Amino acid sequence: MAAHLLLSGHHVTVYNRTPAKAQAFLAEYGDTGRVQTATTPRQAAEGAEVVFSCVGNDHDLAQVILGDEGALNGMDPHTILVDHTTASAQIARELFEHCIKAGVDFIDAPVSGGQGGAQNGLLTVMCGGETQAFEKIRPLAMAFSRACTLMGESGAGQLTKMVNQICIAGLVQGLGEGIAFGMKAGLDMNLVLDVISKGAAQSWQMENRGKTMVADQFDFGFAVDWMRKDLNIVLQEAQKNGARLPVTALVDQFYADVQQMGGRRWDTSSLIKRLT
């Protein structure tokens, strides 16, 4: 995502909690003359018009934004903070309030599309916040996305991402069961996928994960650990708003089984490992 911003002509300052990753980015793109590294989030944010963040969870997010050396302490008034972390709606709203007090705009903007989407500039960005700030950052976000949409007020981006993860959980489990059934039935599952992907069963998961599931390949993509983190956020939010998510809760436990099998870093499509 940072590379797409840089290659679109913007000046970029990068910070990573693993310094070697920031240095590797500098080594790869330093010859553009528009990139530098920072040693703290605060330093990275100093003088920036827009600050983008993307970390692991609520705790990490609070640390890099609100800590003594956090980004917010380095941001000038009228700067816009855009957070791409998949986090809770609660922390999105809390950050919005902190930013308002500091004279800074905040957009919660989780993404969908995985590593491939980020690398190819084809992410989907779902945003929550105020319209004026969103309109300013949308052209920047389009450098690494194919869609960037304002879903509502602060927190709406995170709530939309939760809907996304609920749908993925059910789709991947259904796809895994279908493939496992077909294999037990002695069908050529690659041929089956070619056929049914042209009908009503077609999905992104089928197109991009079906054949790797057949081939028992899972050493890529979106890790099971991260999916469980996301589903935990979903299930906690469902307890607050009264939504009933029986299938999502069940699939979350199936992912726990995959973790016990040693699949913490396997792609989410590894749900099929429980069935074969």
Where are these regions (language model features)?
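Active-site-proximal catalytic alpha-helix in oxidoreductases
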Residues: 121-128, 149, 153-185, 196-208, ...
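Interdomain hinge/lid region at the active-site interface
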Residues: 154, 202-268, 275
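NAD(P)+-binding Rossmann beta1-loop-alpha1 motif at the extreme N-terminus of oxidoreductases
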Residues: 1-53, 78, 84-85, 115
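Short phosphate-binding/catalytic loops that engage adenosine nucleotides
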Residues: 10-11, 104, 187
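A short helix-to-beta-strand connector/capping loop
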Residues: 30-36, 102-104, 146, 243
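Hydrophobic residues within alpha-helices
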Residues: 1-5, 95, 140, 181
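Rossmann-fold dinucleotide-binding core
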Residues: 55, 86-166
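Rossmann-fold NAD(P) dinucleotide-binding segment
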Residues: 41-105
